Swiss-Prot record:
Sections of the chain in a coiled coil: none
GO biological process annotation, one example: ascospore formation
Keywords: Sporulation
Domain of life: Eukaryota
Subcellular location: Spore wall
Protein name: Outer spore wall protein 1
Species in which this protein is naturally found: Saccharomyces cerevisiae (strain ATCC 204508 / S288c) (Baker's yeast)
The keyword Transferase belongs to this UniProt entry's keyword annotation: no
Protein function: May be involved in a late step of spore wall assembly.
Oxidoreductase is among the record's keywords: no
Gene Ontology CC annotation, any one: spore wall
Amino acid sequence: MRAPPSPRKSKSGHFFYLYFRLCQLFSGRKLKRRWHVHKLHIHQYNTRWNLSPLSEIHIEDMINEPSGLCPGSSKKKPLLIARFPKGCQESPRVYVLQRNNLSRLKLSKRKYALRFYHNEIFGNNLKRKDGSIHKVEHQQCAETVRKIKKVTANHADVKIIFHDKNTIRSDKLGGRSNKMQTRPSVLEEDVEEEVSSVYIRFCDDHSLRVKDYHSLHRHSKKSSKEKRNNQEIGKSKLLGKLFEEETSRQNKGVEKKLDTIVIQKFQNYPIVSFSRVI
């Protein structure tokens, strides 16, 4: 039985390809894209920006607009991505999507790559003169985004990855020891109430209380004395088992093998020493 023949290739695809190439040639799309990337690299080393503070919060600074609402000219500009991995109190990480130079030399099949964008101009006003960071506010992230857009919006399609999305923010976790040191007269009941009021927040809409989940709350209930006692009991049980195994081997007359642990207990001192037989 003969195999079916391969479908015929339409010649109309060649005309569409030539038409697309001619449009790119006369419109200068590649030259414009390279010009935008060049201007972005010039801006990243220019630190003389007089950016006025925000008078009000804009909604486009807190969310990413859908692609249908974005202007058509933004699609012709290089993509600039800014993200806040450490929160709004730290400088953002900014990247520019541009053509990979190795792909032109046929050394790599990766046509585009994300290049790090110098971001000191976006994080200068986040710290005070004494080195301390300003108090985190809701509009602080919007101010940084507005600053990025003012500098780069004319030559890039700016997209923001906010730190609140898919990130767990925790408050007061692990701070019980600090509270006990600063306030030694605090009762244990008050401390347990403070621990029970701990919340883990997922974004701004969802949160859970540590007290409602036994697996999260059981470690905070144990005091320091109980933890030390449990550790001492666990060590004594382990040493007792090893000592019993060694004595049983000696009573049975089993020959000692290489790399075995010998336990010697001193009469006058409550010390158990470990030694290796070579």
